[in-house]
Amino acid sequence: MSGKREFKSFGSTEETMFSQHHKIPSTSEMYAEPENFLEIEVRNPKTHVPNGVDQRGMYTDYEIICRTNLPNFHKRASRVRRRYSDFEFFRKCLLKEISMLNNPRVVVPHLPGKIYLSNRFSDEVIEERRQGLNRWMQIVAGHPLLQSGSKTLIRFIEDDKFVG
C-alpha cells in the first residue's frame, strides 16, 4: 500500500517543530535589559516642618525614582522629590499638553483624593497616599504615547524643580 504514512506522536512533532524554528534563549538573553523600558517608583515620603513646631507650614513630599533607556529622555536614571500639589500641577499641565496635541487616545486618571483630615500626617495616611500616587504614576508613565511624546512627563520625572 503506497498511501501509508509514518505515524508521529504530537510530542515528537512538537519537539521537531521547536528545534527547527525556535531558538531557546540563553540565560543572559532572558534576563537582559528589555529593548525599551521605563521603570518608575514613588517612595520614601518625608514630612517637613518648616516653622519648627508650627503645623501650618507642614507638608509631605515623595521621592520619584526613574530608570529608562527611552531615547527621548535626557537621563538614564533620575531621582526627584515632589509634593502632592506638584502632582496636581503636573496633571493640569499634562491635560493641557494632550489637548494641544489633540490626542483623544490618552486619558489621564484622577489623582488619589486630597486629604483634609487632621491626621493627614499620620504614617498610615501618608503610606496610603504614597501607594495611590505610585499607582497613578505607573499608569501615567506607562502610557506608550506619553512615554514617546510628552515633554511634560519628562520634565516632571527629571527636573529638580517642576515648573510645568
Swiss-Prot record:
Its main location: cytoplasm. Residues 10-26 have a biased composition (Polar residues). SMART domains: PX. It is a peripheral membrane protein. A 1,2-diacyl-sn-glycero-3-phospho-(1D-myo-inositol-3-phosphate) binds at residues 83, 85, 114, 120, 129. One of its GO terms (biological process) is endocytic recycling. It is found in: Cytoplasm; Golgi apparatus membrane; Prevacuolar compartment membrane. Residues 1-26 are annotated as: Disordered. Keywords: Cytoplasm, Golgi apparatus, Lipid-binding, Membrane, Protein transport, Transport. GO terms for molecular function: phosphatidylinositol-3-phosphate binding. The keyword Translocase does not apply. The keyword Protein transport applies. InterPro entries: PX_dom, PX_dom_sf, Sorting_Nexin. It comes from the Eukaryota. Belongs to the sorting nexin family. Required for retention of late Golgi membrane proteins. Component of the retrieval machinery that functions by direct interaction with the cytosolic tails of certain TGN membrane proteins during the sorting/budding process at the prevacuolar compartment. Binds phosphatidylinositol 3-phosphate (PtdIns(P3)). This is Sorting nexin-3. It comes from Candida glabrata (strain ATCC 2001 / BCRC 20586 / JCM 3761 / NBRC 0622 / NRRL Y-65 / CBS 138) (Yeast).
